[in-house]
Amino acid sequence: MGKTYVGSRLRQLRRERDLSQASLAATLGLSASYVNQIEHDVRPLTVPVLLRITEAFGVDATFFSRDDDSRLLAEVQDVMLDREINPANVELQELSEMVYNHPQLARAMVEMHQRYRNVRDKFSIAVDNRTNTPEERRPIAEAVSMPHEEVRDFIYARQNYFDALDRRAEAIAAQLGWQPYDSRAMEDSIARRLQMDHDVTITSSKEESGTLHHFDPETRLLTIHARLNPGQRAFRMATELGYLEANDLIEGIVDDGIWSTPEARTLAIRGVASYFAAAVMLPYKIFHSEAEKSGYDIEYLGQLFGVGYETTAHRLSTLQRPNLRGIPFTFVRVDRAGNMSKRQSATGFHFTHYGGTCPLWNVFETFTNPGQVLRQFAQMPDGRNYLWISRTVRHHEARFGEVDKMFAIGLGCEARHADRTVYSRGFNLQDLSTATPIGSGCRVCTRENCAQRAFPSVHGRINIDAHESTIAPY
C-alpha cells in the first residue's frame, strides 16, 4: 500500500458519527495527536489503521479510495462544461483535488447547478409561452419541472442503495419463506400477509384501462390486472406491503431530498417503494450469493427468482451493502430514440446532461437484435475500460396490432471486475486494441478523429480547412 493521505475523508467520517478526535482515537486505540496528524495529512493512512477503521465503523476500504470519487468528479466536470456559467476551462487535476479534499463542497456545487438548471428551464419556458393561451401554458409549465429527473438524480446520488430499507425487506422476505423457482409461492405468501395482517382484499381485473394495479386505502381493496404473471403480481403486492410495513423508512428516505413539486415527491415515494418490492422479491444475501455463484448471469437469476430481465439487471446494480458488495454496475434503460428513462450507477460511469448519448455504444445495437444478449468491451476517453451487457425487453404485449413498448437494458461494469461474470468469456480484456472507443456524447467527448461525431466538442475550437476533408467532420 503506497502512501495514502485521507485527512478529509477521516474528518468526514468522524463528523458523520458525531465523534470528537479524542473519542475517535479511543475507539481506534490510537493517540489523539496521531488522529489529528492523519486528519491534517501529516501522516498517511497505514494498513493496520485502515483495518481498525473498517472494523469499527463498517465502512469499506474503498471509502478512502480516490477511485470512489470518480463519479462525483464527473458530475463536477459536467458543471464546468456549462458555458453559460463557466466560459473558462478548468484543469482536471484542480477539480480532482477539490473533490477529494472537499467532497461536501463539490456535492453542494453539483446540487446548486441542478437547481440553477431547473430555474433556467422554467424561465425559458415562461418567455417562450408569452404568446400562448393559459390552456397551452399549463401542461408545458408542469412538464418542465421534470419530476422524473429529480427522482432519478436523487437515487443516483445515493448509489441506488438504501441500507435500512433493504434490510427491512430482507427480513420480511425471510418471514414469507422465499423459495427458488417459485414466484407463485411468493405471490401466495405476500397475499396471505396482506389479507391476514392488514385486512386487504385482493381481486383481479380484466379491464383494458391501462391500470396494472390499484390499491384503495379506504376500502382496503387491491385490484391487480389478470394479464400479469405471478412474479409481476407478487411485485405489485410487495410494493403495497412496503407502504403498510415500511412506510416510516420510505418517508424518511424521501424526506432527505429537496423536491420542487409535490408530484416529484410522490414519484420518489413510489420509486423507493418499488425498491422495497425488489428487495423483497430478490432478498439481498441470497441474491448476492447466487449472483456470485452464477457469474452474474442475468437470465439465470431471473428464472431463479421469478422476475423479468429488467428487474434482475436493476437489482444487480443495487448490490452496494457495506462489507457485502457485489460488482459495482451501471444500469440504463433507453428507447430507440436514445431517451434514457432509467439510469443508475454504482461506478464512476457518468451520464452528462449536455452530451447526449454515443451511437457506438452497443446498447443501441440491441434494437436490431431483439431478445439477444450482446456484449461490448468499451473504452471511455478518460482511459477507463468497461464491459457492457445489453438486451432488449418488451413491456405489456397485448393484442395483435397494438403498439407495445420496447427498451434496451444496459448493464456495465469496469473491466477489472469483468472476470467475475460469465459475460467475459471469450474476451481478451487485456488487449486494449479490441476495445470500442465510446464517449458520453459528442458535445462533451474529447475523442479526436471519430467518424461518428455529430457535433463539435465544447472542449476546443473548431479548426476547419476549406481545402481539406477528414474522417471527422469537425
Swiss-Prot record:
Q: Which GO terms describe its molecular function?
A: DNA binding; DNA-binding transcription factor activity
Which gene is this protein's source? ramB
- What is the protein named? HTH-type transcriptional regulator RamB
Induction statement? RamB represses its own expression. Additionally, ramB expression is subject to carbon source-dependent positive control by RamA.
- Role: During growth on glucose, RamB negatively controls the expression of aceA, aceB, ack and pta genes which are involved in acetate metabolism. RamB is also a negative regulator of rpf2 gene expression during growth on acetate as the sole carbon source.
DNA-binding positions are 21-40
Task: Report any one BP term from Gene Ontology.
Answer: regulation of DNA-templated transcription
InterPro entries given in the database record: Bact_TransReg_Diox, Cro/C1-type_HTH, HTH_RamB, IrrE_HExxH, Lambda_DNA-bd_dom_sf, ScfR_C
